[in-house]
Amino acid sequence: MIEHFDVAVLGLGPGGEVAADRLLKAGKNVVVFERELIGGECAYWACIPSKTVLRPPEARTEIERAAGVSGAELDWAATAKYRDYMIRNLNDQAQVDGYTKEGAVVIKDEARVTGPGRIQAGDREITAEHIIIATGSNAVIPSLEGLDQITAWTNRETYTTSTLPERAVIIGGSAVGVETATFLARFGVSVTLIHRGERLLDREDARVGELAHQYLQEAGIDIRLSTSAARARREGADSIIDLQTRNGDPVGEVGADVVIFATGRTPRTEGLGFEHAGVTLGDHGKVQIDDHCRAGENVWAIGDVTGIMPFTHVAKYQGRIAADAILGRPHPATYDGIPRVVFTDPEIAGAGLTEEQATKQGIRTIATELDLADAIARPWTYEQDPRGHLGLLADADRKILIGAWAVGPMAGEWIHHASLAIRTQLPIDTLLDQVAQVPTYHEAYQVALEQLDLTP
């Protein structure tokens, strides 16, 4: 028997959940499909467990750097126990029950599109007026000779492990790689971080990469730049990676108990039949969407599967965009100023354009960088030997902020000041009229804005 619904949501990660919740509250008849766990990658294997295990080392650092406090010790067993609580011990029954109570039909199976408005999941055939594709992404492990001989992890094994390795090699120096390096090193693991680029976090401003490199080295992490894995092999209990330069020249080897691949993600679209609903797939299987998250007639796509800023908060935002379009109150998605945070120690945050991106767009820019300890009191009241930098990027002609980055304690919390300014295109004169609480990290914006020379 064919079952019919107003909306079918394929994938219940953060984006799918937001869309489903919004539609259910509006009285729509909704069916949701989830092949693994409701909450998706973020809730069980990425954002939530990673930030949970990063917090104890961060707290220890705060205690070590604060005057008059000592004695903080890390307890991995207790940390792992709380992490397991946070990821619900990989059990989503409460979420299944919750959606059922809200009136949704929950199907725990992989859904495949078989035609316009038609979906097959196991032996169930579904039709729907609207389909929302929210199938997420998969971790990428590059093809590597000898890969099957070594102990290879992705974020999933890393953030659900009950036992920490003594030595780890991490391949990839973007956000996941440097966060993972921070977590493991702070818990006493000997970490080697391999990155094929010339600097860490190479999608951020160059200065951000420099500061990240400095702080990771201070944490005892062995960083190998302009280096990649040539092949893998096992020697006894050791997983060995033979290294090469960007030109392919051999440059030694490194051994560890585990090799962690932080080498990106790819949209989960293969074999799911989206083309049968008129969906166009781009590079690496990205679902092509317009500014209302429309992927085809009565088909919508949100989150990692679109390849647009693959962050949880963006997926949730797109979930609102798609649901509102279905409900007849459309408004276009815009991505200016959306924050991005790397939860290292100290934190790294950014919003808007980098200087390189702005230059490529032909924008005449003015930039400034502030050493927080030289400019405001809060870093000194927060910790001894204070850390922290803030960079601002302005459009010299429009006299608005178009980019910002911050490296320092809780940077992910106070980057939102810049994020809102960039997103709303607030004039810098208006920002200068802001009165910041003293002493707070927000005060740094006032000092940095004063440094921007916007005279013609």
Where are these regions (language model features)?
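Hydrophobic/small residue at the entry helix of a nucleotide-binding pocket
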Residues: G15, G39, V176
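A Rossmann-like FAD-binding core segment of flavoenzymes
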Residues: V105-K108, R112-Q120, G188-D291, L353, ...
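Glycine-rich dinucleotide-binding loop and its adjacent helix/turn
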Residues: C47, T135-S190, I194, A219-I223, ...
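FAD-site-proximal beta/loop scaffold in flavoenzymes
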Residues: D148-L164, V254-A325
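Glycine-rich flavin
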Residues: I2-F5, R22-K28, F33-L164, G197-L201, ...
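Beta1/beta-strand and adjacent pyrophosphate-binding region of the FAD-binding site
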Residues: M1-G13, L164-S174
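Flexible, glycine-rich terminal cap/loop adjacent to redox cofactors
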Residues: L10-E36, I48, T52-A59, F343-T354, ...
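Short hydrophobic core segments
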Residues: A8-L10, A111, I126-G136, I170-I171, ...
